Each structure stands twice: as structure tokens, then as C-alpha cells.
Amino acid sequence: MIIEWVPYNNLQNIEYLTKGGISEIYTAVWIDGRYEEWDSKEQKLIRYGRQEVILKGLENVENANQRWFEEAESHLKISNKWPQIVQCFGLTQNPSNGNYMLVIDRADIDLRKYLQETQNQLSWKERIKIAHDITLALSIIHSESAIHRDLHSGNILYSKLNQRWYISDLGFCGPADKLTDSIYGNLPYIAPEVISGKNTTKKADIYSIGMLMWEISSGQPPFSYYENDYNLALNIINGMRPKVISGTPLKYENLMKQCWDADPSNRPDIDTLFDGIYSLLQYYQNISNEILQQETNNNLENNKIINNSMSKHINSTLFTSKIHKFKNLPEPKNAIEGMSRKFSKVFKKLNIKSNNDIQINYGKEIVEQQQIRQYNFNIDDEDETYDYKNFHSEEDNVFEIPDGKII
């Protein structure tokens, strides 16, 4: 695929669409369209013809360093090499203000809007297919030794023609001149170690996938009612995660929790995650349509209740990629680590003498959950949970359909 310069006068019907993060986004018609095929007789490339495209502004490119340009070029090549990534055809420049813009293939809808419009009609088979397409696309990005850095439901795009989900915005996340002591992204999807100031790695992308998996299950963005970025950042670092939606398949839940573990080394790599999602999709594809329809009907009312309760609280300003700058944040941890310290203080205050062997081997989880119910450590049971380590045995991971029901 050729990355080309698109003359601005070759674009028509340019209309403002929205503001995506710090970039203004427009729709347009590219008169000539992309290169489609090679005409061996005429010995020239044949163009597609009139084509709808997206124009995305690039901020402060003139101040970018050489590394930014090298990374941008590499990611452009990746996006045009693999069909699972939204294609970027090239660059153009608005002559009225001198701003550079990406010329990108246009999709039909993003994941956030799609879920909000269709959640009550989606079966688990359809939801897992979404997760499958996303993890497949990310596996390709990681195989090219690249990192996305800003995965969220606004840049997961759907093509009705191809019936496939794509990842977009690869390599152009944030301003070119972003300060080194700041981070850029959509806060609910940013990994805790990145929030606390560490470098972004592939495992940070995996954390974002965990948040997307939860959004696919619930139909709503995570932490949708938070008003304060700093409070949300601190809670994420301290182990707060969204509450698992009732009816979520156990295998899916386990993978999701592994993805959002506070310790990056505990998260699966993308190949392991993709294999898990793929096996789950295969399982659901072998289930009869009758059982799938029963499962969809059973979840319909539950999803309506979830969506109605969550939609009242959505803070649209939170779900925008932007620059964040947090100082003096603690090291990320899973909530069980922080809770254990709180419980030890409670035991001392109540003069509770516990047998360590009993606590470790017989009832640790039960004791801790009882203490959580008795003492309110700023946990809202209706909206978020301080996520515990996965206590399921290996036997729990086996797929079963007891009494014709899907779990």
C-alpha cells in the first residue's frame, strides 16, 4: 500500500464531524480515491474513484522530534500492511491554516456508540466476536513490535461491509510535542503503571483490552460517572476495577481480570489472550441457535436495568483522550494488597486473634468479605469493586452447559 500526499483540492464536501481527543475530525470525499490495483497493460496504478474518508488533524507536527516521525512512519506502514488495522492513505494540508491532516479510511460506527445502541440485542456469541476481532488486530500490532498506547472504544471501528472490527489511530495518539513527564490517553483505559509515571509497554495495551472487555459485557464505558480525573487515577492505582456484570461467562471473566491486574507481569501477552478468546468463540459457535436465543432473552431485562442505571451518570468529558499530568502517586497495587493492611488494623482494634493457618488455608476470602461488609472502605457495591485475585480452581475454567444454561 502506498502512503501518499493528497492535495487538499482533491478533497470535497469537507464537514466537521467531532473532536477526537485534541484533534478535530472531518468527513470528506476524496475525488480520485486510493490506489486500487495495478494495470499491467497500461503499466500504471488504477485508482478506486470517489471515496468517503476521514480527515484527522495532527497537532504541533512542526515541533515533533525525529523519533516521532520515525514512529509515525512505521505505524503508517503497519496500518497499510494488515487489513485488521484501519488504513491511513496519506497526508494532506489545510491551506487556510497550514495544519497537517491524516487521510483515513472511513468506517461505519465506533464501538462505544455501537454498544449503546445494540447492547440489549447482543448475545454473548456476538460480544465475544467483537473481543476476538480486537485482540486479533492487537496481536498484529504487537507482532510488529509496536504499541498502540491509546486503546479505547472510540477508536475501535466497525465496517458493515466486511462485518469486522478494526483498531484505528495507530501511532498518532496525542500531540507530537507531548512533554515527557505527562501521559496522553483516555483515563479509564490507561494502565495504572502508566498513570503512576512508568513507561508504556505492550502490557499497558493488554490492560486497555481488559477495560474494553468489560465495556463489551456491560454496554457502557468503565467508570462512567467520575467527575474528577485525579480521584479516578488514584482509585485505579489503588486497585479499583469495574464490577463484573452478572451473567458474564466465567472464562471471559477470568481473562478480563488477568488483563486488568495491577502487576503487568501477571497480565497475559496478546497471543495467550487471543487464544483464550478464540477458544471461547469456538465454544459459542458450536451452541445451537435455540440456546443462544434463550440466553439473549434471559439477559435482555438485566441489560436494560444496567444500561438505565449507568447512562444517568455518564460523564462525556471523561471519555476523551487528552494530556494528563499526575504527581506523587503511589505504586499500583491490586486491591487485595491494600485491603489486607486495612484488615490487620481492624483486627487489632477489635482485639481479634486469628490463627494464621486457618486464615490462609480455610477462610481468608470469607473473613475478608465479611469485614468489607462490616466496614465501609469507600467501596460502592453498585458501581465498582476492589478486584480480588482469581480464586477459581482450574476445574472452574471448563466450559459446561448445566440444564441447558450457558455459563
What are these regions (language model features)?
Residues H142-S159:
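Catalytic-loop of the protein kinase fold
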Residues K243-S246, W260-T272:
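A conserved short helix/loop substructure at the end of the activation segment
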Residues G154-P188:
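Activation segment/activation loop of eukaryotic-type protein kinase catalytic domains
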Residues E24-E59:
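Glycine-rich ATP phosphate-binding loop
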Residues E117-K129:
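Activation segment of protein kinase catalytic domains, centered on the conserved DFG
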Residues D205:
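Conserved catalytic-loop aspartate of Hanks-type protein kinases
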Residues N97-D110:
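Conserved short submotifs of the Hanks-type protein kinase catalytic core
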